[in-house]
Amino acid sequence: GTGMICELGHTSIDWNGIPCDCGNRGCLEKYISSDIIERRLMEATGDGKPFAAFCSEMEDALVKKEKGMEWTEREKKMDVIFSDMTEKLACGLISFCNSFNPQRVIIGHEGWWIPDYYLLQAEEILNCRQIFRKYRKIPIVKAFFGTESTRIGCTGALLTAIFNGGLI
């Protein structure tokens, strides 16, 4: 092996989609990266805050809805964007899981901020459509190290290469 981790962001969800820097078309990150979702949320709300803050606001809105309270127009617009993101994420995960048959999907980096509600929806869609659905369920979990998971994972991969004599 190369010691490289999987790059889910470059799983194509549209063969004729938006050109990606990797050379492919329709890569997931061109539709649902935190930067893309943040920009869509900014356009929908007129608010210029970071992705994590929008996720926190949506988490609060979901609690509000759970208590039977009505959503504001702003919250409804945000839900449309998060729900669209969920569908696209599930689409990419279905292709990924059908190809690699992982034990679980771990969401880290900026994805760690995504409200659990939407990750549970993505997990439900994944497990209704993935090829192994009759035999097992693939959970979607948040990375233990949260937003630092990418940095820690890269450090671990580098240290593994050093200790295995690959870089010395």
Task: Please provide the spans of the model-predicted regions.
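ATP-binding/phosphotransfer module of carbohydrate and carboxylate kinases, centering on a glycine-rich
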Residues: W15-P19, L28-I168
